[in-house]
């Protein structure tokens, strides 16, 4: 018997279905949908595959990040997913857009058995108007999310019962063996990392905001370095928190929502994000008080990688059409695990390329399935290594060209640890200090001061200004 197909339900309808058919889904005290992704609470990078087709073979940087899957194996994986989806009682279909700049917008269609996943993608992508839905037509990319169904590890190219496969030729993503919703949004980011360079545009794993004078700041960084928190600035307008493209006209957000780490979320220092976790939002793997339904943002008993997803409309001052000009400031966020880096450093063009391609940060516990429980230094090219398709130097050259053309200033900001190692009890940089530094970047204070080379770090420099040092 074919499934009952629920096509493009509204968010309240998806919430109702989740409460009806998902045994562990419930509403929080403020109306967000609390859900579980079960066994996988983070991305599965070891199970990511890109299909080896003739149209992308020469472009892809094959290796540990981009592992090959043959077209024959992909066909078998796709068959498993489609057969599973076709035999469920309920099938949810979501049509959305990726990309606020309509010149480069993708039409995305998602098939999933979980209303939580459907609501997540409505939150994360751009929801069409009724008129746009009426003329949506065939999608540019299709996501078959059969995460409740396990993959067959005997299929050549697979090594486990999880598979997250992307086929650029057929324009499809297949998900098996993981119910972690983040795999869908990162799949779209990977697609853009291949499509945008074909038009000489830079895809960025970065957040962005814009000031009242139109000055744009882009924040590069891996999960947990502060992209979402720092871009949600009450004095500036949010463009987006994670995925952007820098074109010949400026910056646009790929997404229509935010996906924030929730562990340790403080309603006083991160009020914008806290207030966004209301009806229509998704609280993923968060622990609720059984009596009150309040989220305990400090409870790690399910996982460290607790998440909240919400539409941009939940953030006061966020741009509804998330497009802005060329960046005045580019900030690299690094979570230094050893406490040896300065709170902030200004970079020359050459230094910026070094740090961008190197992508030093620290592993944030819980972001990847099976990840370490303690912070350790890692190097993730372009501050987005897991999502790059081409070689890192390709994106580095793109960034250098754009920064030079538009005279962008570049900064390295340590949002990690100060005064010692993370695994020896050191405290993380206070958020108020980091925000004060960013304010000093935006008002020009850090740009109007003399700098000196930072001992032991020939590629960085720090301000000699007493005012700046008092902040840091």
Curated annotation (Swiss-Prot):
This is Phosphoenolpyruvate carboxykinase (ATP), glycosomal. One of its GO terms (cellular component) is glycosome. Keywords: ATP-binding, Decarboxylase, Gluconeogenesis, Glycosome, Lyase, Nucleotide-binding, Peroxisome. It catalyses: oxaloacetate + ATP = phosphoenolpyruvate + ADP + CO2. InterPro entries: PEP_carboxykinase_ATP, PEP_carboxykinase_C, PEP_carboxykinase_N, PEPCK_ATP_CS. Belongs to the phosphoenolpyruvate carboxykinase (ATP) family. It comes from the Eukaryota. It comes from Trypanosoma cruzi. It is found in: Glycosome. HAMAP family: PEPCK_ATP. Pfam families: PEPCK_ATP (PF01293). The gene is PEPCK. PANTHER family: PHOSPHOENOLPYRUVATE CARBOXYKINASE (ATP), PHOSPHOENOLPYRUVATE CARBOXYKINASE ATP. Homodimer. ATP binds at residues 221-228.
């Amino acid at each position: 018997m074919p499934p009952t197909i629920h096509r493009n339900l509204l968010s309240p309808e998806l919430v109702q279905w989740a409460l009806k058919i998902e045994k562990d889904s419930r509403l929080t005290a403020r109306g967000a949908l609390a859900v579980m992704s079960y066994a996988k609470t983070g991305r599965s990078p070891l199970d990511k595959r890109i299909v080896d087709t003739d149209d992308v073979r020469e472009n892809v940087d094959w290796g540990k990040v981009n592992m090959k899957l043959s077209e024959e194996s992909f066909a078998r994986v796709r068959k498993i997913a489609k057969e599973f989806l076709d035999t469920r009682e309920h099938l949810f279909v979501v049509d959305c857009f990726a990309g606020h700049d309509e010149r480069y917008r993708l039409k995305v269609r998602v098939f999933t058995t979980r209303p939580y996943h459907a609501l997540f993608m409505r939150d994360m992508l751009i929801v069409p108007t009724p008129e746009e839905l009426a003329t949506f037509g065939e999608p540019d990319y299709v996501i078959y999310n059969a995460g409740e169904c396990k993959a067959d590890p005997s299929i050549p190219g697979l090594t486990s019962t999880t598979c997250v496969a992307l086929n650029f030729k057929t324009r499809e993503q297949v998900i098996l063996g993981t119910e972690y919703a983040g795999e869908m949004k990162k799949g779209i980011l990977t697609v853009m990392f291949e499509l945008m360079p074909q038009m000489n545009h830079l895809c960025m794993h970065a957040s962005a905001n814009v000031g009242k004078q139109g000055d744009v700041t882009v924040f590069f960084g891996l999960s947990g370095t502060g992209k979402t928190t720092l871009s949600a600035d009450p004095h500036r307008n949010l463009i987006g928190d994670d995925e952007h493209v820098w074109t010949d006209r400026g910056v646009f957000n790929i997404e229509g929502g935010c996906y924030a780490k929730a562990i340790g979320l403080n309603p006083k220092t991160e009020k914008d994000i806290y207030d966004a976790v209301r009806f229509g939002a998704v609280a993923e793997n968060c622990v609720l008080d059984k009596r009150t339904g309040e989220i305990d943002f400090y409870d790690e008993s399910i996982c460290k990688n607790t998440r909240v997803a919400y539409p941009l409309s939940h953030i006061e001052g966020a741009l509804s059409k998330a497009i802005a000009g060329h960046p005045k400031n580019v900030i690299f966020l690094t979570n230094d695990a050893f406490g040896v880096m300065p709170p902030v450093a200004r970079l020359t063009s050459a230094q910026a390329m070094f740090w961008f391609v190197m992508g030093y940060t620290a592993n944030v516990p819980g972001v990847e399935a099976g990840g370490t429980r303690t912070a350790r230094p890692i190097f993730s090219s372009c501050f987005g290594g897991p999502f790059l398709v081409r070689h890192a130097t390709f994106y580095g050259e793109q960034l250098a060209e754009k920064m030079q053309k538009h005279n962008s200033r570049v900064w390295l900001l340590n949002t990690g640890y100060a005064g010692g190692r993370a695994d020896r009890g050191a405290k993380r940089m206070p958020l108020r200090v980091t925000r004060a530094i960013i304010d000093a970047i935006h008002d020009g204070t850090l740009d109007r001061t003399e700098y000196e080379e930072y001992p032991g770090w020939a590629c960085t420099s720090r301000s000699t200004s007493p005012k700046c040092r008092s902040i840091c």
